[in-house]
UniProtKB/Swiss-Prot annotation:
<comment type="function">
    <text>Extracellular dipeptidyl-peptidase which removes N-terminal dipeptides sequentially from polypeptides having unsubstituted N-termini. Contributes to pathogenicity.</text>
</comment>
<keyword id="KW-0843">Virulence</keyword>
<feature type="glycosylation site" description="N-linked (GlcNAc...) asparagine">
    <location>
        <position position="699"/>
    </location>
</feature>
<feature type="active site" description="Charge relay system">
    <location>
        <position position="673"/>
    </location>
</feature>
<feature type="glycosylation site" description="N-linked (GlcNAc...) asparagine">
    <location>
        <position position="252"/>
    </location>
</feature>
<keyword id="KW-0378">Hydrolase</keyword>
<protein>
    <recommendedName>
        <fullName>Dipeptidyl-peptidase 5</fullName>
        <ecNumber>3.4.14.-</ecNumber>
    </recommendedName>
</protein>
<comment type="similarity">
    <text>Belongs to the peptidase S9C family.</text>
</comment>
<feature type="signal peptide">
    <location>
        <begin position="1"/>
        <end position="19"/>
    </location>
</feature>
<keyword id="KW-0964">Secreted</keyword>
<dbReference type="Pfam" id="PF00326">
    <property type="entry name" value="Peptidase_S9"/>
</dbReference>
<keyword id="KW-0325">Glycoprotein</keyword>
<dbReference type="GO" id="GO:0005576">
    <property type="term" value="C:extracellular region"/>
</dbReference>
<dbReference type="GO" id="GO:0006508">
    <property type="term" value="P:proteolysis"/>
</dbReference>
<feature type="active site" description="Charge relay system">
    <location>
        <position position="641"/>
    </location>
</feature>
<dbReference type="GO" id="GO:0004252">
    <property type="term" value="F:serine-type endopeptidase activity"/>
</dbReference>
<dbReference type="InterPro" id="IPR029058">
    <property type="entry name" value="AB_hydrolase_fold"/>
</dbReference>
Amino acid sequence: MAAAKWLIASLAFASSGLAFTPEDFISAPRRGEAIPDPKGELAVFHVSKYNFDKKDRPSGWNLLNLKNGDISVLTTDSDISEITWLGDGTKIVYVNGTDSVKGGVGIWISDAKNFGNAYKAGSVNGAFSGLKLAKSGDKINFVGYGQSTTKGDLYNEAAAKEAVSSARIYDSLFVRHWDTYVGTQFNAVFSGALTKSGDKYSFDGKLKNLVHPVKYAESPYPPFGGSGDYDLSSDGKTVAFMSKAPELPKANLTTTYIFVVPHDGSRVAEPINKRNGPRTPQAIEGASSSPVFSPDGKRIAYLQMATKNYESDRRVIHIAEVGSNKPVQRIASNWDRSPEVVKWSSDGRTLYVTAEDHATGKLFTLPADARDSHKPAVVKHDGSVSSFYFVGSSKSVLISGNSLWSNALFQVATPGRPNRKLFYANEHDPELKGLGPNDIEPLWVDGARTKIHSWIVKPTGFDKNKVYPLAFLIHGGPQGSWGDSWSTRWNPRVWADQGYVVVAPNPTGSTGFGQKLTDDITNDWGGAPYKDLVKIWEHVRDHIKYIDTDNGIAAGASFGGFMVNWIQGHDLGRKFKALVSHDGTFVGSSKIGTDELFFIEHDFNGTFFEARQNYDRWDCSKPELVAKWSTPQLVIHNDFDFRLSVAEGVGLFNVLQEKGIPSRFLNFPDETHWVTKPENSLVWHQQVLGWINKWSGINKSNPKSIKLSDCPIEVVDHEAHSYFDY
């Protein structure tokens, strides 16, 4: 009955206008990864859904039957932040954010088949998440993470003393990172244990900080680190975690170590791959990730890059023996793909890894002792893999994924066999009705140096005999890609269903097409990538008759925003009716204001003061480029974007206004490099789509398309005339 109510609630938000609207997009249910029980019969996953009428996002937890794909409601308690399996039949352990300890969380035990019979095992005195558990004798050892104080205690924001001043004082970097000014607290992995008495478990509230004894270490590493940054051995006795190299400047270098430490913290954690260490392969000193123990706990597999200041270098699989002085082994090191996650099969003989390949996140397998020349085998599945877990002790895995046409794909994949579909959101959610793979196709075009891939995304009800304006979307990174995956921010299908055909290119600098294409953007931001885009645009103009390039638009965020600004000052800028630049750099020298200096120092071949000419080479604000500007442009920049200052967007808008070019500035004071809050996201879509629809002519040809006037936010306009009216 509860499941039926959930579906009925979804029906209430289905749009009666365009096929796939921003409201549909934002309010469609969002599902987390599905985690199977030890026997491989059920999986639990988180689900939430935004309600525009009530302005809230209720959430809960569902169960997925791994035999038939049926879904049932486990709980609708929005205070439960995570659930995992206890390892004992269908028993589960979960974290509840509402606790008797102010600012703390509760650890609860229940059964997936009788959730209402839950009991509290104990409290944690602070925010705590990322539980991983393993039986150790008569106890269940666990690890998780929270913030640490300088003394090594779990930080509790609610219990912290209020500072007498708002001053911040720094003697080293980072000052701020992503969206936050760095404070004295830092992330740390903590260990604890559940003790069994009778048929119940209890937790005494005692945690051991495993990271604090290593001065300047931090794990998980912000801003995006999580439970994938550490692991617990199957016997519960040993923990592995990754941290930036404590002895090196974190804002300038990406060097990361994998540390090993006893679960009880009886010894200080030690790195197994220290730079220039006796076990570390020669010249390997880049970022490490994804540490995971073998089933017997004797080996650790992890991923590592070679270059010490390059966050987009190729990752290679490494295997280290625990408690040994033997050199770390590199596995399939010649494979020209960059794996993202690695896991062991239950017998410890096979590795399963995910890696981006030709704009799709794929699952691969390879022997744990593979030679350097070995090429991993693809496991068949649909869409891109977000996460995967083994189904019981079998070779099959439960994949949680998505695609350009569905925001959730639950499927079982087995090496050498067809995949087995369990649940695809586009076949169930009314908001996603009509979405499917038939409206997506790849495009390959000769670029500046090699063939370049793009996605073509067509609107619902596409008719090849009609003509649709071009929406030319440029991805960020620049070392990133438009993949066959669902985005909760820039979603090509939302743009297409306004009445466009979207072309989403993967030019020089993109990932998943071999490391050379990724590396070739170094110190060439406005070179080969721009030429690739010109060639793709020309191919579309000359060979795809159902795309109208005369009334097309171009838009991009981050590096894509830079590229839109670059295009505005070049010939390609005159080919579009409108431009949209979201969080893009404008003044070349302003890049020194970023947070992660290793990024710019790699991409521009040196520091700001030693290689200044490289920063200035790709300066969109050069007078000779600004002189060419004329295309209407929407500029978006947010106050908590510490990747590049909001002043970049304001400066760009200043110049557009002084030149008398139709332009608008959109700012969210509470958003970061991304726009993630539902109501802000709706305004963002209303402004962006309204802007391009106005200039492309879509508003005239499609009366149901979004208009700028659809946005309820009042526009600030205090000038009767532009500067050049005088």
